């Protein structure tokens, strides 16, 4: 219900029609939303900026350029955006900016539809807030209640969680709400699909009346708009279509490998091709990244590797080496498939096909950034053919068998 900052200019802001007409409203970005092209010009605290760059972000995505400043101003915000647009970092950066670290009480509450997403949000907050000494807890079902209570008693600046468990903790008075300044509803449409409507309303009733509300949703069905009417004061609207990553100019190939073990030999055969410019090799798990890195090194190939479990400092120096061109081949997980620009990368290898098709464009859409041409090679086992065809269909693209002269194409 944050309406204090900048609620002037009724004419500037097209008034929303009556609620029942909302379905016909072409949801568009409010007129007063300006674009802030860099993280440096957002007025963020120094220790947060360090965390943002250390995490590997260089330039804010479309939603980050528009929403962060509005949220920091204290405005209620409705952002319509799909996953893959940088939405999580948008509210995470905003939340971290608004915290008073000296006060060991919960100041921001983030609700998410799944345990996995809540944990992902918590990890992202801890990574971005690495230099701020931020305390952040994931409050999710299926875990030990006693552990939750202990963590909350210790004092957490931010709590991310699923509505059921969060409400349970509020009811038990383990999660104190008096210092909460901001409520974030991530993937709000998904939460409603999962039947969390009652719990969200229950949680909301316990929050201080002036709590700022940020709602993120890929779709805006009637129930969501009903919720925004109840929870929000004069919200700013931001519509972000999915990142305009393109597969144009990127030649995509697959290599059929009968067995998992043969992927390694295929990679070794390709190594000389990899080092023509710079290459990123994607695996689906951290363990696989570590295993492949070790195996490549044992075979006397020079590679560097990175994933979310490595200490921040280590990741920073690996990224620095890779950016400078000192290391040519980087093995990584999807943590790095977003928000990273290394212009020299013109070859991507999917050692494992991504777990979901949206990640595909994040992995390889990057290799053609700045209008550069790129090549993507997918290692495909027999049972992956289905996934590959699905990716082709989803992106209306064509993935051919890799030719012998692939080096000439890079």
UniProtKB/Swiss-Prot annotation:
ATP binds at residues 59, 64, 81-89, 341, 366-370. A motif (Q motif) lies at residues 37-65. The keyword Iron does not apply. InterPro entries: DEAD/DEAH_box_helicase_dom, Helicase_ATP-bd, Helicase_C-like, P-loop_NTPase, RNA-helicase_DEAD-box_CS, RNA_helicase_DEAD_Q_motif. ATP-dependent RNA helicase. Involved in pre-mRNA splicing as component of the spliceosome. Core component of the splicing-dependent multiprotein exon junction complex (EJC) deposited at splice junctions on mRNAs. The EJC is a dynamic structure consisting of core proteins and several peripheral nuclear and cytoplasmic associated factors that join the complex only transiently either during EJC assembly or during subsequent mRNA metabolism. This is Eukaryotic initiation factor 4A-III. It comes from Taeniopygia guttata. It catalyses: ATP + H2O = ADP + phosphate + H(+). It comes from the Eukaryota.
């Amino acid at each position: 219900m944050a309406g204090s900052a900048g609620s002037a200019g009724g004419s500037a802001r097209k008034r929303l029609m009556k609620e029942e007409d909302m379905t016909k409203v072409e949801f568009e970005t409010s007129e007063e939303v300006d674009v802030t092209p860099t993280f440096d010009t957002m007025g963020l605290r120094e220790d947060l900026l360090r965390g943002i760059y250390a995490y590997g972000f260089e330039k804010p995505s479309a939603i980050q350029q528009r929403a962060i400043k509005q949220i920091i101003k204290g405005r209620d915000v409705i952002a319509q955006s799909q996953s893959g647009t940088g939405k999580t970092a948008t509210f995470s950066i905003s939340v971290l900016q608004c915290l008073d670290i000296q006060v060991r009480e919960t100041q921001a509450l983030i609700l998410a539809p799944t345990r996995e997403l809540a944990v992902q949000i918590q990890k992202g907050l801890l990574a971005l807030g690495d230099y701020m000494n931020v305390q952040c807890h994931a409050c999710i079902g299926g875990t030990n209640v006693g552990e939750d209570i202990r963590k909350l008693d210790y004092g957490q600046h931010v709590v991310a969680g699923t509505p059921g468990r969060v409400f349970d903790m509020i009811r038990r008075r383990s999660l104190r709400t008096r210092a909460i300044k901001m409520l974030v509803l991530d993937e709000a449409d998904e939460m409603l699909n999962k039947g969390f409507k009652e719990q969200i309303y229950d949680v909301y009733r316990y929050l201080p009346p002036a709590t700022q509300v940020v709602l993120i949703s890929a779709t805006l069905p009637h129930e969501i708009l009903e919720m925004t009417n109840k929870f929000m004061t004069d919200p700013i609207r931001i519509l972000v279509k999915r990142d305009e990553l393109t597969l144009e100019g990127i030649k995509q190939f697959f290599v059929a490998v009968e067995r998992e073990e043969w992927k390694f030999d295929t990679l070794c055969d390709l190594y000389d091709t990899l080092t023509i410019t710079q290459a990123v090799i994607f695996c689906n798990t951290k363990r696989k990244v570590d295993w492949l890195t070790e195996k490549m090194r044992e075979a006397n190939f020079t590679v560097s590797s990175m994933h979310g479990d490595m200490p921040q400092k280590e990741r920073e120096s690996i990224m620095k080496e890779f950016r400078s061109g000192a290391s040519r081949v980087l093995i990584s997980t999807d943590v790095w498939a977003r928000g990273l620009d290394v212009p020299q990368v013109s070859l991507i290898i999917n050692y494992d096909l991504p777990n979901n098709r949206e990640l595909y464009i994040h992995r390889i859409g990057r290799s053609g950034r700045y209008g550069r041409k790129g090549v993507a090679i997918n290692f495909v086992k027999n049972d992956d053919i289905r996934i590959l065809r699905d990716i082709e269909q989803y992106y209306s693209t064509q993935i051919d068998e890799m030719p012998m002269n692939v080096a000439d194409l890079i």
